């Protein structure tokens, strides 16, 4: 065998083995809150394509876990091996840092906008034609109105609902005592407290319970789009709502153990560059 041929074969073998060494298999777990299923199904497919442009030999599988934000945070504290968390409230991730000790206390400083790649707000979803005439928060405590909202103990969306209701009560009543009185009366109109926002949507949309659903804006629009929802429901934007800022974070110790730190960081950074915003969003000046 000529020296040129031996050199060529050696170079080819070196390239093959080098390629094998570089190519990796990744399995990433994103632990998220309830109504982000569809968002991350779309985003995960987009991210895999993005990653493979620079890492063509890699195999990437992204798993999703969804539920009430508080409940999901508790699961991570108790050992669910999330590489990233994309939860409804910063407080839920703070608890993971404090009790789980799997990421630093200053996690919000690592990504832009306090690690908040997207925002939302709270709106009302009512039956078609709005038969109960629900226009604002004050209408929710009318005698014959039944309100569907998740449990604030387990759901991040429910806590945003609570804060928006409190803000209305404070503005309308002029004192914290009046705000507390309003919120207490509001929850007397809630027949069932599901553990998460998607569960409450099912209760309202599929099971037909309640006159109004307090919903994430994206969840309300999804209800209109699915199964002829536009013929069954209307969205009401109250006079005052809240600017909800769901944060994201890499769970350092979990990602490190699985060799996923680089891809987990890229997963969240890329989230900022490819999100699409709807022109139907509520005006920010109507939020508090």
Name every feature range the model reports, one short phrase each.
Residues 172-239:
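Ligand-binding pocket segment of bilobal, Venus flytrap-like solute-binding proteins
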Residues 277-282, 286:
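Conserved small/polar residues in nucleotide/adenosyl-binding loops
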Residues 1-9:
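Bacterial N-terminal signal peptides that target proteins for export
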Residues 24-154:
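N-terminal segment of the mature folded domain
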Residues 31-33, 107-117, 126-128, 138, 146-172, 224-242, ...:
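Short beta-strand->loop
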Residues 19-23:
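Sec/Tat signal peptide C-region and signal peptidase I cleavage site
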